[in-house]
Amino acid sequence: MLRHNVPVRRDLDQIAADNGFDFHIIDNEIYWDESRAYRFTLRQIEEQIEKPTAELHQMCLEVVDRAVKDEEILTQLAIPPLYWDVIAESWRARDPSLYGRMDFAWCGNAPVKLLEYNADTPTSLYESAYFQWLWLEDARRSGVIPRDADQYNAIQERLISRFSELYSREPFYFCCCQDTDEDRSTVLYLQDCAEQAGQESRFIYIEELGLGVGGVLTDLDDNVIQRAFKLYPLEWMMRDDNGPLLRKRREQWVEPLWKSILSNKGLMPLLWRFFPGHPNLLASWFEGEKSQIAAGESYVRKPIYSREGGNVTIFDGQNNVVDHADGDYADEPMIYQAFQPLPRFGDSYTLIGSWIVDDEACGMGIREDNTLITKDTSRFVPHYIAG
């Protein structure tokens, strides 16, 4: 894995506008950063990214299978007891899943380490699957990278294939919250993939969803919604006043209820418990197990439910705060994880996001930040394969 500088396309702003990439600049700061690129060999991708991703995902599914049968685990995950049985039912029925993203730290000369699994509402999808590929094609044509360079990126192909498998005559609704440009772009991109797969689709904001007779979900025209993709966290749905309606299982939600086990950072101590010493895992503990942290060991404290680095704190071996990110999740239960520093290239720390669609590893995206904690403002940098 090498990073090097590359020229930015002169018409980047126009290319982004033409392709609906409305958030390549966020708050007047660069988000999509193509002034640099990461180069990987095919062997690095296959052995150090793709293979571990596939293995870790299967391990995660085993955790789900154990968790739905164990009330102690569900309690540790802070999942409300009201939903335990329907989560188990969702798993037994193998309610269909679409995608997820594993976040890795990798220094290039040791196994990747899983930091967390964003299995419910992962973003940076459009950038990884589509806009990054456009960059590759332009970079090859212009000679910025080798003409025969490739990219670890079959994400869009797998998404369209998965939507084909989920085909139904019933409209597939796609929803997110209002006033979130990134979320809206992600959802519209997924909607486009569904339409390429032959699905009839409709977009609606979460705030516009209604309730019909008997608690059925409806759109603005009072049509009953039977299937919906939501870029809206499952734990928020469970805590909502209408959350108990999830128990009726009238709608098919993507992601399904069983994903609440994987979208929870409590997954990390469970993985360590069931697969201790695995080379791609970091030692992790629940709040009641933090005494197991070795004296002098650096560690990270994370809320069970948090996003984009919110309320994550890094401590050194003397319990001094090394780095901290503010957020809205300070009141959530915490987990603790052995500290694995992200590799540093120049002034930036690098995080690899490895994508899974329909249980298959299929691509990646790279984020950079000036701090050790990756946040929603962290830059996205393209990659390619050569050699």
Sequence positions of predicted segments:
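Preference for protein termini
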Residues: M1-G387
